[in-house]
């Protein structure tokens, strides 16, 4: 029996932008894309910022794009997830955070907050520290101590004074919190098993060992005078007037580690949280019965509580297709194969029942501007054979060219990449239409739409421009305010499959 396949075709890195200069999408001759755009219902989708779970104004990327597409909902990345929780009042009601505060109150012990002291947004955000201070204040906690890790890597190398000034203003405003130690991230956030670095941080925080200063500002000033900048500031102790440490971490204390990115948070967390820690001798005073909270899930190896548990993405597009006994194909060349498989399945490696995967090798060249067609023709031939063989109900396809060649920042090769993809697109969509099927033509983020800046410089990064969506079925009308998370519900509508409640995206078909 002839199948009427529904295909989701992702032109990776292909967005729409009015400005013609440096725009490979407008420069390319793409008769097939233009034909489908003119003949069929079309619209644009937001593929960056909060529409895909990133901070406002941040460009999208392939991983995030495919996660959102496959999930059929906005998948909040950790930074945005915590930001949204703060904005909507959920942060101060977080049971895990409240339990840490309650522990310190009931035991009459201290609450320690530690993490990277910047707004870099890569490992942490200082606003999350401020939210914790507000939470502690609202719960009536007085003994709250901050162990600041200085950045200088995701932000300017000598920016610590700015963040300390702002932090001290917040401490003054809220009437809670005191800085107890400072340490460059080189020590406290090592991830390469350089335990001697982590130990220096640990001993400052637990034993009050290390250079001592009467204020955080004095510590930074002294380091700068010695040519040591933020990232490399030696773990240092802030002292009271009598020379004793402001605070050390002791038995029964509570700790909240407010970094959200795991890789550089694991080792120092192991040091405090794990009873069976053996990487260095923690000494006699190692704090017992700590109530240790990680902001997000750092690792199975960390024996702590988790405030924002991982989002398990249930009922992704692939899972729903499988539950409905529909045959699905994932096809791409090497560069984007993980995206149409692992990321589109919500971070799942295994295939679903009824899922077939075709991987076409990407060409072995130093950079793809040397071969802008990449393996698009081979991908197309393999897919046409599948369509002819009536094997698939649903097809998930990625063309890597506009993104991978766009990263070269070179106009002519990127134009060639798009013209190649357009040729392939025509063959594939015509084959699907000949079977009575439907194609959804779209993209995951921008790139090829700006490969040269208005000043004439190469532009190798992604863009925040909207991406196209075309549905090759007459008589439909599409919404104009769509996001990537609306693509899976649209595909399910075309397949006449019920949308699960976990998919909070909405079909684009009016």
From Swiss-Prot:
Enzyme category, top tier: isomerase
Reactions accelerated catalytically: (2R)-2-phosphoglycerate = (2R)-3-phosphoglycerate
Pathway membership: Carbohydrate degradation; glycolysis; pyruvate from D-glyceraldehyde 3-phosphate: step 3/5
Key words of the record: Glycolysis, Isomerase, Manganese, Metal-binding, Phosphoprotein, Sporulation
Binding annotation for substrate: 123, 153-154, 185, 191, 261-264, 336
An example Gene Ontology biological process: sporulation resulting in formation of a cellular spore
Cofactor note: Binds 2 manganese ions per subunit.
Matching Pfam families: iPGM_N, Metalloenzyme
Disulfide topology: none
Active site (UniProt): 62 (phosphoserine intermediate)
Residue runs in coiled coils: none
Listed cofactors: Mn(2+)
TM spans (from-to): none
Chain positions recorded as Mn(2+) 1 binding sites: 403, 407, 462
Binding, Mn(2+) 2: 12, 62, 444-445
EC number(s) recorded for this UniProt protein: 5.4.2.12
One cellular component term from this protein's GO annotations in UniProt: cytosol
MF annotations from Gene Ontology: manganese ion binding; phosphoglycerate mutase activity
Subunit structure: Monomer.
Record's function text: Essential for rapid growth and for sporulation. Catalyzes the interconversion of 2-phosphoglycerate and 3-phosphoglycerate.
Sequence similarity: Belongs to the BPG-independent phosphoglycerate mutase family.
Record-given protein name: 2,3-bisphosphoglycerate-independent phosphoglycerate mutase
């Amino acid at each position: 029996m002839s199948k009427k396949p529904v295909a989701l075709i992702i032109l990776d890195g292909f967005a729409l932008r009015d400005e013609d200069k440096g725009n490979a999408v407008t420069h390319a001759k793409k008769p097939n894309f233009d034909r489908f755009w003119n003949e069929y219902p079309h619209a644009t989708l937001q593929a960056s910022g909060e529409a895909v779970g990133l901070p406002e104004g941040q460009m999208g990327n392939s991983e995030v794009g495919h996660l959102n597409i496959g999930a059929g909902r906005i998948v909040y990345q950790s930074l945005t997830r915590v930001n949204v929780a703060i904005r909507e009042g959920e942060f101060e009601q977080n049971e895990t955070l409240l339990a840490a505060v309650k522990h310190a109150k009931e035991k009459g012990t201290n609450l320690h907050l530690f993490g990277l002291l910047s707004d870099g947004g890569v490992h942490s955000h200082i606003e999350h520290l401020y939210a914790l201070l507000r939470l502690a204040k609202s719960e009536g906690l007085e003994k709250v101590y901050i162990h600041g890790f200085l950045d200088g890597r995701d932000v300017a190398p000598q920016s610590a004074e700015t963040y300390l000034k702002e932090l001290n203003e917040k401490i003054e405003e809220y009437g809670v919190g005191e800085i107890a130690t400072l340490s460059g991230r080189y020590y406290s956030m090592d991830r390469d098993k350089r335990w001697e670095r982590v130990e220096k941080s640990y001993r400052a925080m637990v034993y009050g060992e290390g250079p001592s200063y009467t204020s955080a500002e004095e510590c930074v000033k002294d380091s700068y005078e010695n040519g040591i900048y933020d990232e490399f500031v030696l773990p240092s102790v802030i002292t009271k007037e009598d020379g004793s440490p402001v605070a050390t971490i002791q038995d029964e204390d509570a700790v909240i580690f407010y970094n959200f990115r795991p890789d550089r948070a694991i080792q120092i967390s192991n040091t405090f949280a794990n009873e069976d820690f053996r990487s260095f001798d923690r000494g006699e005073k190692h704090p017992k019965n700590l109530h240790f909270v990680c902001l997000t899930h750092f690792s199975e190896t960390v024996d702590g509580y988790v405030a924002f548990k991982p989002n398990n993405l249930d009922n992704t597009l692939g899972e729903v297709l499988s539950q409905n006994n529909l045959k699905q194909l994932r096809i791409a060349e090497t560069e984007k194969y993980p995206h149409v498989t692992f990321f589109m399945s919500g971070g799942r490696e295994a295939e679903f029942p009824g899922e077939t995967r075709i991987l076409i090798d990407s060409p072995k060249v130093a950079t793809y501007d040397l071969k802008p067609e990449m393996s698009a023709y081979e991908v197309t031939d393999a897919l046409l054979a599948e369509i002819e063989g009536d094997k698939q109900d649903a097809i998930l396809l990625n063309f890597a060219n506009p993104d991978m060649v766009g990263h070269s920042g070179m106009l002519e090769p990127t134009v060639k990449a798009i013209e190649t993809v357009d040729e392939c697109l025509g063959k594939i969509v015509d084959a699907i239409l000949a079977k009575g099927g439907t194609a959804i033509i779209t993209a995951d983020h921008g790139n090829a739409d700006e490969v040269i800046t208005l000043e004439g410089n190469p532009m190798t990064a992604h863009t925040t421009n909207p991406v196209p969506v075309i549905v090759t079925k007459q008589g439909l009308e599409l919404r104009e305010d769509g996001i990537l998370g609306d693509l899976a519900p649209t595909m399910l509508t075309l397949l006449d499959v019920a949308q699960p409640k976990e998919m909070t995206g909405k079909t684009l078909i009016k």
